[in-house]
Each structure stands twice: as structure tokens, then as C-alpha cells.
Amino acid sequence: MSSSFTLASTSSSSQNGLGKTSSFSSKSSLRRISRRRLLSSSSFDTSSATTEKNNSNDTKTKTRGSRRATKTAAAAASGGAATAKASKSSSSLKKRDNEWILQARDACVSSESSSESWVERMRSSASKQLSESKTPTNRDESWRFFDVSEITSATLVREDDSEADVEEDMKAFLADVPEGAKVVAFVNGRFSEKWSSIDEDDKNGVSISRTISGDIATAIGTYDEDEEVEGQGAIFARINKSCARSDNVACITVKSENVENIVYIIHARRSSKDRKDGELATGANARVFIDALAKSSVSVVEKYATVGGSGKKHDSRYWANDVVEIHLAENARVFHSLSQDHGREAVHTRATYVRQNESSMYEINEVNVGAKLHRHDLRVKQLGKKTDTKLNCFNLAGSKQTQDLHSAIILDFEEGTTDQRHRCIVSSSSGKGVFDGNVRVNKLAQRTDAKQITRNLLLVPKATVNARPNLQIIADDVKCTHGCTVSDLEEEELFYIQSRGLTKEIARSLLVSGFGTEIISGMKGGEKFKEYVRETVKSALSKDAVELLVA
């Protein structure tokens, strides 16, 4: 059920309450300690003032006081030792954190120096950020439902960046690209000139370049430094930044307002051999910067897939860690479609940062069906009036899969709008869906309209969804709604469809296939791409014995 809010809503009151409780407890402890010391001192002084007749009692009292003082000193020494031990433990934990972060960085890319000033700036910034970071665990709120130990406890093995054995796969991917579309291709996170459309001089449409200069050289790698929108997921974006190189970064500049502008970004991941238990292959960390100039328009289509050579997909163990930064100038429009179909042994962490200026529009439609663990940190900040943001996501979690979306939208200006629709199907008892969506409407964001809804479908018993939609409203002239539903297939809906002469199996198939149709239908990139996405959903469901008998 959706609920509306028109008043300020923050969590500061509960935090203040916790602070007061903590302060009261500390004062109570001090009073108890002081009272004990007074009693001890009083007893000792009284015994010192006794008459000669009570000398024996005085000696006994002094002895007890001496013993008590000895115990107090011992306790103090023990406390000091405990403090030293805790300090040593903290230092040890920090050392382990640093060791893992360095291991992750070194496994992703070699550490040779670069003559590019923007590369050195990004690496220096990331080094400082990571020195203040700690390795995430399930004890951290942001990682409670994501088994991050799959990454942090694994032995990371750097994968060969060679493009061998991917030719047939890439040809198959490119066959679905509409005529006239530009292509940006990455193989194991490394930019591929062979399969990309490098065109740095296109002054009227869309240019693709590996040369980072001007305003982009200043902006790239800075969006994760905004503390207002950033969360604990930033550590992987910062590892990506620490691995910056000129050959794992691509820049897309959109200059034309032609609505037919299309850019395909293909992320092909492969592992040349099976990995031992506990090993996780990794490669370069891809980063894309999209600069949509004033009044420009573009459709960006991203496709993630595991390739195994000879056109065959296989489930190899690897970790992909990518970042996309998008800047929209005034009146720019970006339609973003994303399909993630990694193999079911892969781990994928991704961050998307969006900055929107006045009257711009950003829309994403993403479908995630692959990977053993998938985490998308999506951060959007509106930087001007009349800005429009649409975030649409369909996740499918099957056997032993976790599909996790963490999003944050910041509205800072008047008459902004945002609409977030999240759908998740969990088709296995060992599958898990996670949604943590945050929308913050700041004080100056008057006359805004913010909507957020998450709908989750559990197809089997013991399937799990952890959903937390969150609206923080500080402005007082707004229209905001949010809601959350978690359910299995409704018997009434099944009965209604069966009453039309269809079998229960077809009725079930209709309801399941229709659950994510709204998101898929909104994708750009042509009908071939949409059909590809539908097939990935159908294939993923079939792995968990959920057959779609209708298209």
C-alpha cells in the first residue's frame, strides 16, 4: 500500500534519543564509581581516628583498605592492558583492511605510472579515500544482506586481458546493434579498439574517445566524493578509481539533439580456465564517462555477458567491478538501458553516478538476471530546476543468487520530479532480492513530485526479499508517495485466468512473464535488443524449473 508524506521526515530524533540514553548510562556509571571511592575513603579515615582501645580493629580495617586499594590498582592495570589490547586489535584490523584493499587493487590492474595527469589525480584521490576506508562486512548496514565475503575472502587472481577466443561472441553481439549506432566494447574490463567505434571528430552526433581532456579530465572520478549521496558501497568504486588507466576508460560526448542517437556499450567477460575453490579471477576495471551537452539526446544501451569462446557461454568465477559517470547539461536527455547476464558463478559490483542540470531528463531501465552476486549502487543528484529522473529496475534472483539494488536520489531544486519502480522475482528458496532505495527531498526542493514503489514476487517457499524504500522529506510543499509489496502468486488471479479456459501452468506463466514486462518494454535499443532481454529472462527462469509457456 502506498502512503503519502507532506511533512518533514528525518531520523535525527531517534539518533538524539540514543545519544541521551548513552550519556545517562555513562553518568550513572560515574556516580556508582564515585560512591564506591567515597565509601572506601570514609571507612579508612574512620578507622584511622579510632581510640587506642580499638587498635586491633584499626589494623584490620587498614588491611582491608589496603587490599581494596591493591585490587583497584590491579583493576586499573587490567583496564590499561585491555585498552592496549583493544588498540592493538584495532590496529591489526586496520592492517588487514589495508592488505585486502591493496590486494584488490593490485589484482585488478598493474601499478605502472602514467603520464596522464587525470590518471595520477584519480589514483591519488582514491589512495587517500581507501586509506580511510575499511573492508566491508555483513556487520555494516549497507552490506547486511550481501555476502561480500565472496570477494573479500577470495584469492584474487589477475586474468589475462587478451581478446583471444571472443571473436564469435562479439560478432553475435554486434549483429543486434542497429545500423548507425556507435559501439564501445570492453573485454575483461579493457577497452577494445578492434570492436569499438572510435570517432573523436564527430561534431554533430556522438563522439567516442579515449582521450580525456578539458572539463571531463577535471570531472571524471569525482562524483563518488559527494558525501551526501555516497554510501558504503563506494569502496568498490574507489578501488575502480585506484586502477585508473587510459586503456580501461572511454569517454562518450553527445552533441546532437537527434533522438536516433544510439550508443551500445558491450562488456564481455571471460575466464580462460576453471578456478580452484576460493579463487576469483579479475581483470581491469572498466569506467565510462558520458557527457550529454545542452539540448542533446542519446540512448545508451549496456550489455553484460559471460563469454567462453566459440560462442559458448559458461559459468566461470570472476569479479567485474565497473563505474559509469553521467553528466547531463541543461535540457539534455539520456535514455539508459542495461542488461546484465553474467554467468551464475560471477560476482558483479557496479556504480552509476548521475548529475543532472536544469530541465534535463535521465531514465534508466535495467534488467539483471545473471551473476551469483550482483550489486548496483545507483546515485543521482538533481542540480537544477524542473529536472526529471526515472529509475526502473527488474531483478531476477534464482538458485544461490543475490540481486541487490542500492539507490539514492537527491532533490535540491524546485519542481523536480522522480519516479522509481523496482520489480523483483525470486524463483528459488536459496535466492535473495535486496532493495534499498533512498529519496531525499531537501528544504529548497519545493513543489516536487517523488514516487517510489517496490513490488516483489516470491515463487517458492523460503524465497527471500529484503526491501527498504525510504523517503526523507524536508521541504513542505511536495507530493511524495512510496510503497512496498511482497507476495506470491495470488490464487484469485490464477483462478480468474483459468476461468478463461487456460490451464494453471499457462496462467502461472502469464503472471510471471507479465511481472517485468513493463520494465523491458521501456528499454531502448531496438526490438532485437528487447527480444534478447526477454530470452535471458526466460532462460534464467528455466534454470529454476520455472517454464514460461507464453512469450
Q: Residue locations for each model-derived region?
A:
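Conserved beta-strand/loop scaffold segments within soluble protein domains that form the structured core
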Residues: 222-502, 516, 520-551
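Short, intrinsically disordered, low-complexity terminal/loop segments
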Residues: 2-4, 74, 550-551
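Compositionally biased low-complexity segments, especially N-terminal hydrophobic helices
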Residues: 36-42, 48-57, 61-62, 70-84, ...
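N-terminal chloroplast transit peptides
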Residues: 1-53, 58
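Residue-identity detector for glycine
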Residues: 17-19, 65, 79-80
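Short, low-to-moderate order helix/coil transition modules at the start of elongated helical scaffolds
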Residues: 64-68, 83-334, 339, 343-344
